[in-house]
Amino acid sequence: WIQFLGVAEGVSDQKLMLAGAIGDWSVYQCLIHVASWDEEVIRIVSEFIDSGTRKTPGVPHDLNNKQLEQKKDLDSDMTWQYLRDSHTTFMSYVQGLPEEMFDTESYTGEWIGITVPNHYKGHREDIERFTARS
């Protein structure tokens, strides 16, 4: 997370809105995507804890498009605030979980300990590639 945030914060204001940073997305759209997925993981893990139901988030492109559409009117400050608030909420949620939820061999542990960090890492690398070529 810290590395992802550091790389994203290092992108100039001029480049933040440019399409093509991550596929067709701008860096701002990537920030919304990452924040929305922090929220989605809370939902997935909570549902599993409550019901034992293992959920997959569905077709990722559909969910991504829905997330971006819902947040399309956020300005720069609101986008950064949404990213930080979502991560703070995610971390508060995770810190309140019992230890057994973090076993990487478990369903919840895979989401929390593998999927989320890899998500941050992957998009950090996307942004690094974008800034190197633009």
Describe the predicted segments one by one:
Residues 63-101:
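Acidic/histidine-rich alpha-helical segments that form the ligand environment
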Residues 1-12, 38-42, 46, 84-98, ...:
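Structural signal for well-ordered, non-membrane alpha-helices
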Residues 1, 76-83, 113-116, 120:
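Hydrophobic packing residues in well-ordered alpha-helices of helical domains and bundles
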Residues 15, 68, 74-76, 108-112:
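Residue-level detector of alpha-helix boundaries and kinks
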Residues 17-62, 99-134:
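Short, contiguous alpha-helical
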